[in-house]
Amino acid sequence: MNAHSPAAKTAIVIGAGFGGLALAIRLQSAGIATTLVEARDKPGGRAYVWHDQGHLFDAGPTVITDPDALKELWALTGQDMARDVTLMPVSPFYRLMWPGGKVFDYVNEADQLERQIAQFNPDDLEGYRRFRDYAEEVYQEGYVKLGTVPFLKLGQMLKAAPALMKLEAYKSVHAKVATFIKDPYLRQAFSYHTLLVGGNPFSTSSIYALIHALERRGGVWFAKGGTNQLVAGMVALFERLGGQMLLNAKVARIDTDGPRATGVTLADGRALTADMVASNGDVMHNYRDLLGHTARGQSRAKSLNAKRWSMSLFVLHFGLREAPKDVAHHTILFGPRYKELVNEIFKGPKLAEDFSLYLHSPCTTDPEMAPPGMSTHYVLAPVPHLGRADIDWAVEGPRYADRILASLEERLIPNLRANLTTTRIFTPSDFASELNAHHGSAFSVEPILTQSAWFRPHNRDKTIRNFYLVGAGTHPGAGIPGVVGSAKATAQVMLSDLASA
């Protein structure tokens, strides 16, 4: 066997979130003996899962788009994702609700969508169609052409720049939407998506309008049994391919020898060696903590600290004795303010008095997520990260949860608090302590234009040449399609490096 063939090589991937799992599958599929090391007792990263009183709670991502990107992981070795995962369509994609009673069902059926747009403002129909065409353009340019390109060289960014400038990528999503649509509610409806990947609609590049086209093309889906079942399916595929996963295996450091990574040392003292090391962990954690013993780690951590980080989330999981009627799978409950609230979420310096909420009600699509007749939910509020607002979440968390439950009861689910079976909160402090998230950020580095593509942490380190990044902190960014795309980009680099070694 050729000493430089992929089959002769080994890799360690740190972190069994979606990005780490997707990368490990790609490497193992290419014949690289891959070990996936996960600090927690279950795989999934942010997509953790737990059971409580018969309720099945997904901890993290709940919106599955671009199913073809997931199916590709199975197709690499001639397998079918349906063997391990059942995807269920979600309709409407989202239900948007405002104080005062306005409701907009974000659906994929063009006639239904346009009929609702006309009810808000008939004059915006033509503008919406032009926005739809624009979203398709940026989808082709930003997602299809560039979404899995590893931007390792400035020349790659310069090559992409003319098309991005033509598409006015320097404008924010909201500003671009506003050039097509005049109604303020509809402007919110077609710009809020960036919040789902950690971006401020008023500063995130208009390239992210591609999400509208991505959802129209591929739909919005839910994994039967919960997002955790997508994780379980990916683990099953990885292990069938011969990959090894270690749980309760916290990495204490990435070992190096000069400009090369040689493996990892676990917190229990075990040392693992490999030809290549990749990390799906928080990008600051990688450099500050795991590589903090190196000059590269120290210098990179300093530069990362100067970057803008995405907001955090306050997450409240709860079960109900009853299944509420007429509640959509995904509901966005806007507050009385939009731009002002979003700016306070991203800039601090304190927790706002009002909030906008995202409610996940999976039993609408899959009743088996709760005991018969009951329902499982989680609600989240975007909040400032720990570097923007000095909030004692041990004190504020329970109070904030009470305010959120009261709001849900008033606006959407009557008698909610009387029907509670269980609750659990996850705060920015938990993001920091349990997920090593810098500042408790829920989505890593904020996806503004000057922190995207080549400007984002690269998929391969420039100094430690066999150390690679995958996940939300590298190109293209957060969200399931983003981190799965980052795995494809990173795998390309790793396999290319092996081939040229």
Curated annotation (Swiss-Prot):
InterPro entries: Amino_oxidase, Carotenoid/retinoid_OxRdtase, FAD/NAD-bd_sf, Phytoene_DH_bac_CS
PROSITE patterns: PHYTOENE_DH
Recorded metabolic or biological pathway in which this protein acts: Carotenoid biosynthesis; astaxanthin biosynthesis
Biological processes annotated in GO: carotenoid biosynthetic process
Alphabetized UniProt keyword annotations: Carotenoid biosynthesis, FAD, Flavoprotein, Oxidoreductase
Catalysis performed (reactions): 15-cis-phytoene + 4 A = all-trans-lycopene + 4 AH2
Enzyme Commission (EC) number: 1.3.99.31
SUPFAM superfamilies: FAD/NAD(P)-binding domain
Cofactor: FAD
Keyword Oxidoreductase set for record: yes
Gene3D superfamilies: FAD/NAD(P)-binding domain
Amino acids binding FAD: 12-45
GO molecular function per UniProt: oxidoreductase activity, acting on the CH-CH group of donors
Enzyme class at the top of the EC tree: oxidoreductase
The family this protein is said to belong to: Belongs to the carotenoid/retinoid oxidoreductase family.
Functional note: This enzyme converts phytoene into lycopene via the intermediaries of phytofluene, zeta-carotene and neurosporene by the introduction of four double bonds.
Name listed for the protein in its UniProt record: Phytoene desaturase (lycopene-forming)
